[in-house]
Regions:
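Non-catalytic beta-strand/loop surface segments
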Residues: 2-37, 73-127, 151-195
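M16/insulysin-pitrilysin zinc metalloprotease superfamily fold
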Residues: 32-63
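Conserved short hydrophobic interaction patches
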Residues: 48-51, 144-152
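Acidic/histidine-enriched alpha-helical segments
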Residues: 53-71, 137, 156-171
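Non-catalytic, conformational "gating/processing" segments within enzyme and secreted inhibitor domains
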Residues: 63, 113-148
Length: 195
């Protein structure tokens, strides 16, 4: 229903704000809207979960934004480069060793098909959590959620979550990064939490 690039514009026209963030474990989409717009925004999220539209031009534009973000936040910051390399050394068999933003060479190759494949694999009601706060009661939210999301079919592609474990480290892992841009020497020390 909602055309590429229109979601945020609609939220803005409704007097709201929206944004998103990604972590190692989740991607979150959130909106700040008035209570009288809650149903409409929940319907928009249900539509996005089932009918995402991705135009090639939009994907390429967003890919370039991510590349620039990586350059400015990681590549141009020695501390961030070291942090990223430390995580990669610490988590050699776990997804936490992969930067949330991704590696530069992988981002550069991102295509519309890659994005749609990821969407089809992970975006489903049985892989989502709805959180609502504000001037609403749990009963009101549950009624809306049942009406709007209740008929969405779960995805068979979503399997039981695999919780990979990093094998016990038997030797120290040390990294040294020398960078003329670093203002002062810095020591980072990472450890895996005990099981």
């Amino acid at each position: 229903k909602i055309a590429t690039g229109e979601f945020s514009k609609i939220i803005s026209r409704l007097g709201g704000q929206d944004n998103a963030f990604t972590s190692h474990d989740a991607t979150a989409y959130f909106q700040r809207i008035s209570k009288d717009r809650l149903r409409q925004v929940m319907e928009m999220e249900a539509d996005r979960m089932l009918n995402l539209k991705l135009a090639e031009k939009e994907v390429l534009t967003e890919r370039d934004v991510i590349l620039e973000e990586r350059r400015s936040r990681i590549e141009n910051n020695p501390g961030s480069v070291l942090d990223e390399q430390m995580s990669a050394a610490l988590y050699q068999n776990h997804p936490y060793g992969i930067p949330v933003i991704g590696w530069m060479h992988e981002i550069a190759k991102l295509s519309r098909e890659d994005a749609l494949s990821f969407y089809k694999r992970y975006y489903a009601p049985n892989n989502a959590i709805l959180v609502v706060s504000g001037d609403v009661t749990p009963a009101e939210v549950k009624t809306l959620a049942d009406q709007i999301f209740g008929s969405l079919k779960p995805s068979d592609a979503i399997k039981s979550r695999v919780r990979p474990k990093e094998p016990e480290h038997r030797a120290a892992r040390r990294l040294e990064l020398r960078d003329a841009r670093a203002g002062k020497p810095t020591l980072y020390r990472y450890n895996l939490a005990p099981r």
